[in-house]
Amino acid sequence: MAFKHQLILSTAILLAVLAAASASFREQCVPGREITYESLNARREYAVRQTCGYYLSAERQKRRCCDELSKVPELCWCEVLRILMDRRVTKEGVVKGSLLQDMSRCKKLTREFIAGIVGRE
């Protein structure tokens, strides 16, 4: 009986630790904190340049994108790409849709490019 209570207590503690870690992760990868607005725009321009042929030279965009990404904790990189592809958050915290919404004719290609970056097919 004591073993059963100890197991339940251990499980409860483990779940509490996991919940706290999950909340901490979500709070850390928030635009305006660890993810800067400048870094989101640098990645947007690079992704669009790679797939649509717009903006500055590819090498300059790649360098800017990588420089900005290096300032963000690695655990936030996937969140950065998700924000880039799925929504845009202004400095005021307003969600404005996708950062690539204005590039609708290239959106499918850009999504495929971003998926390749994170290792998905």
Curated annotation (Swiss-Prot):
InterPro entries: Bifun_inhib/LTP/seed_sf, Bifunc_inhib/LTP/seed_store. One of its GO terms (molecular function) is serine-type endopeptidase inhibitor activity. It holds the Pfam family Tryp_alpha_amyl. The keyword Mitochondrion does not apply. Residues 1-24 form the signal peptide. Its main location: secreted. One of its GO terms (cellular component) is extracellular region. Belongs to the protease inhibitor I6 (cereal trypsin/alpha-amylase inhibitor) family. This is Trypsin/alpha-amylase inhibitor CMX1/CMX3.
